[in-house]
Design a protein with these regions (language model features):
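The feature captures the beta-strand-to-loop junction immediately N-terminal to the Walker
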Residues: 36-38
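ABC-family P-loop ATPase nucleotide-binding domains
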Residues: 83-139
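Catalytic Walker B motif of ABC-type/P-loop ATPase nucleotide-binding domains
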Residues: 152-156, 161
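Conserved ABC transporter NBD signature motif
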Residues: 59-74
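ABC transporter nucleotide-binding domain
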Residues: 167-256
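Helix-to-loop junction immediately C-terminal to a conserved catalytic motif
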Residues: 51
Length: 297
């Protein structure tokens, strides 16, 4: 299995605080991977390390087996759209495409960028600063795709867009990826958009990877159980209780399934991606808080 992104013991520190710590991660080539976590979890730091904008303070990161800081030949395989989809606001879309060609002489598909923006109705002669937020995001995506990258890194590119612009951006992204078989690592808070488009999941919390794997496998191995008020006793067929809530008469558990059937006293329900992510984030928060106080989680 070819790996698009691989990290081992990866860490980045700002002063005494670790923005990312002991990060062990593998993203297989050909996947559309969602990178999820709260503000401050380390998502942007991870992406900046993967694109070579930062130097690790610990461990290593590899993109298709190579150090992203090793030279321009590695960077030629990486497309990157940063937060707020920055583009030169005084340049027109046509001028940005021309500039991109001069900066990426090894491989640049200007025709692809022009065709994509024309199909979206974005004028070639209007300064980027006068385009809408959604249009600027589409320009940034078109420029990244014009590199014909093997890996596309997107750092919350749709966070500030309205629902229609978000949908148009994600549709454009999915169409482009289907044509090119590009691997995507997409950071976002918008779980509903990710559930419709991503087939691989990476959850970051407290500067560490908390959960990773193919979305379909993770959803298959997790369930919500509703049943009689539970104490500390184990539930048959459950490997791990990720999150629990209780009323006087019943308990609701989000669990990782184990071997064998679930105890028939419990009603079993499928989980959504949002259920899964929020439960693991809450578990990580509770564990770190308990460790800080020196009490059992």
């Amino acid at each position: 299995m070819e790996l698009a992104v691989q990290t081992q013991g990866l860490g980045k520190r700002y002063g005494r605080a670790w923005a990312l710590q002991d990060c062990a991660l593998e993203v297989p080539a050909g996947r559309i991977a969602a990178l999820v976590g709260p503000n401050g979890a380390g998502k942007t730091t991870l992406l900046h390390l993967a694109v070579g904008l930062l130097r690790p303070d610990a461990g290593e990161v590899r993109v298709f087996g190579r150090d992203p800081r090793a030279g321009t030949s590695v960077l030629a395989d990486i497309g990157f759209v940063a937060q707020d989809t920055p583009v030169y606001r005084d340049f027109t879309a046509a001028e940005l495409i021309t500039m991109g060609g001069k900066l990426n002489r090894r491989r640049w598909d200007a025709a692809l960028a022009r065709e994509r923006l024309a199909a979206l109705g974005i004028p070639p002669d209007k300064p980027a600063g006068k385009l809408s937020g959604g249009q600027r995001a589409q320009v940034a995506l078109a420029l990244a795709l014009a590199k014909r990258p093997r890996l596309l890194l997107l750092d919350e590119p749709i966070a500030s867009l309205d629902p229609l612009a978000r949908r148009e951006f994600m549709q454009a992204l999915m169409g482009a990826v289907a044509e090119s078989e590009t691997t995507v690592l997409l950071s976002s808070h918008l779980l509903a958009d990710l559930e419709r488009s991503c087939d691989y999941l990476v959850v970051l919390q407290q500067s560490r990877v908390q959960l990773t794997g193919p979305v379909d496998e993770l959803l298959e191995t997790h369930r919500t159980l509703v049943g009689p008020r539970a104490g500390s006793e184990a539930v048959a067929g459950v490997a791990k209780v990720v999150r629990a809530s209780h009323t006087e008469r019943q308990s609701t558990l989000l669990v990782q399934r184990g071997d064998g059937p679930i105890d028939p006293l419990w009603t079993e329900h499928e989980v959504t991606l949002e259920d899964l992510v929020l439960a693991h984030l809450a578990e990580a928060d509770a564990r770190v808080t308990a460790e800080a106080w020196g009490v059992p989680a």
